[in-house]
Amino acid sequence: MIWMMLLAVQTVPANYDAVAVAPGSHHILMEDERVRVLRVEIAPGATEPVHDHRWPSIMYFEQPQPITYVVYKLVDGKPVETRRIDAPPINVGQTVRAEPEGLHAVSNRGSAPFVAVRVEFKDGRAVGAGGPTP
């Protein structure tokens, strides 16, 4: 998906980890040395804090809603918005692979909570139906 590829090009400092800076929307379901499984929940009308995802992942959309990705870059050590991308419609049960994502936030434009499960692969390889992806 193009909007996810646009987010993958940035390098950011460690203090923007999704769980650390956006704990209200990123809940750890399981974590070990190889994977981290997150439940992502964003209330209707809410925008989560600016954060990143350092590892490739697979996302399963449990309760998709219309969302806007807000992309940021660091300027003098502070995040500055660079663009907004209205994501294409997402279907219930849709699953996508994602590369590591740079600084961004997600706004839920829908009338119900946005809910997804993200499996992050700490070894840098997302596994899917076609096997490992380096």
Question: PLM features: residue spans?
Answer:
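Extracytoplasmic/periplasmic copper-protein system
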Residues: 123-134
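Histidine-centered active-site/metal-ligand motif
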Residues: 51-53, 104
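Short N-terminal segments immediately surrounding and downstream of signal-peptide cleavage
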Residues: 11-33, 132-134
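Short acidic-glycine-tyrosine-enriched beta hairpin
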Residues: 30-34, 73-101
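Glycine- and acidic-residue-biased ligand/ion/polar-headgroup-sensing regions
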Residues: 54-78
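Asparagine-centered strand-capping/turn motif at beta-strand->loop junctions
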Residues: 106-110
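Sec-dependent N-terminal signal peptides
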Residues: 2-10
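Mature N-terminal segment immediately following signal peptide/propeptide cleavage
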Residues: 23-51
